[in-house]
Amino acid sequence: VIADIESKALWDYFDKSMLENVDLIVSCGDLNPKYLSFLATFTKAPVIYVRGNHDAKYEMTPPDGCICIEDDIFEFHGVRLLGLGGSMRYKEGSNMFTEKEMKKRVNKMRFKLRKKDGFDILVTHAPAYQLNDGDDIPHKGFQVFRDLMDCYKPLLFVHANYGGRYKRECKYNETRVVNAYERYYIDIDDEVIEENRKKRGPKTPLIGNLFPK
């Protein structure tokens, strides 16, 4: 996973061997689109991404050879990754949302969630509320991300937008939470993925204020 700042080891001083055993590259946002295009060119691994609050340039120059998973569930070798980019809204502009707006985005995905029977990995730019987030509005997390984890119990949640100010990993109930700042290698055993499939969330969407009837 990559986010927030371009890694000199992967760009300025690129050594192809550093990516030889990487199956998938996941960007959590706020990265130069040329950086993503570069990685897509020099590795066989697919590069998927969500946008950060500083990624307005993607509208005019999206990263070549990469896959945007915004508001979608991308499946890779049976692993389902749900993408929700953007930060908490703190000014006018793209890729920023209020809590209510983010909930509406999730609500629009209810049929995809039902069809895919949930998801395994949550990919976002912003953190979840009171989980590696900040006190200021730009770095505040979304409650709806916690709601998604409570309902679907994903194996992994990867996010960005708060730099190195928190530790790399923590746990939220059964979900492994990773801060993707700069770059971080995540290894998931096939056995762990298979075990998680056996614990997939409900086939029906959430009810209440997240998925109103």
Give the positions of each predicted feature.
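Active-site environment of divalent metal-dependent phosphoester hydrolases
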Residues: 6-11, 31-37, 53-59, 89-93, ...
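N-terminal active-site segment of His-dependent metallophosphoesterases
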Residues: 1-42, 110, 114-118, 212-213
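Binuclear metal-dependent phosphoesterase catalytic core
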Residues: 2, 11, 73-77, 147-152, ...
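A short, gly/pro- and small-residue-rich
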Residues: 43-54, 142-145
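Conserved catalytic scaffold of divalent metal-dependent phosphoesterases
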Residues: 2-10, 51-140, 206
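Active-site neighborhood of phospho(di)ester-bond hydrolases with catalytic His/Asp-centered motifs
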Residues: 2-3, 24-30, 48-53, 69, ...
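A generic local structural motif
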Residues: 10-16, 34-37, 67-69, 106-111, ...
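Short, structured coil segments at secondary-structure junctions
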Residues: 42-43, 63-64, 173-175
